[in-house]
Amino acid sequence: GDLSRAGIPCVGLPGTIDNDIACTDYTIGFDTAMNVAMEAIDKIRDTITSHHRCAIVEVMGARAGWIALEVGIATGASYIGLPENILPGETPKERYERIKVEIAERLKEGQEKGRKNFTVVIAEAVTSLNHVATVEDMAHEIMEMTGIDTRGTCLGHIQRGGSPTVRDRIAATRMGYHAVQILKKGIGNRVVGEKNGTVYDMDIQEALAMKKSLPEDLLDIWRKVGY
């Protein structure tokens, strides 16, 4: 944005694991981060299954819950804590306490149905980001509330590493190619994105001003299927 305003021809690419850039359906790095988180949670599930535990896993998501939502659904989490799940006027601490109670209630419901192990996926905005509590603190408090042996794990920056998936490599190549083509034409002040499978570009200032919401179909699953 600053370089474009200074008159330097610039074309931006949407590169973030959070998938929270509104001008594009998909951001480079999101699929890789989701797969890293999913594989880690799958491995954590192996140990909680054999020891009849609950695992609370904190994933990245400071302002948007894309990783938590999609990874939580993909791994069959019993509860998913999203940054977007905040009531009007609610402080981060109040949200944390409310979500903690909701988790405990969900686990008790599962116990009554005969479940012996649980996975909970929490975005960092719910816990550590706002210095409300660590995921380990939450696990200890949930254990006291439910009597279920509960462990907390923060995946942290492993979500920013790893070998890129095919989807990320192809997305980066398609968008990068498009960026080079418009720069060769002397066009700048643009951001490249993907909409409905098509690569396109738009004004960089307009793109930065846009807001992106979580997809309603996945939110409907989150609300009604009982994750």
Stretches found by the model and what they are:
Residues 3-36, 81-85, 154:
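Short, acidic/small-residue loops that bind anionic groups at enzyme active sites
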Residues 18-22, 63-67, 201:
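Short, well-ordered, mixed-charge alpha-helical segments that flank or form enzyme active sites
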Residues 1-8, 68, 134:
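Short Gly/Thr/Asp-enriched flexible loops that form oxyanion-binding sites at enzyme active sites
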Residues 8-14, 53-57, 78-80, 116-121, ...:
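Structural motif
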Residues 30-148:
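Accessory alpha-helical/coil subdomains and C-terminal extensions
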Residues 131-227:
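C-terminal non-catalytic interaction/assembly regions of soluble proteins
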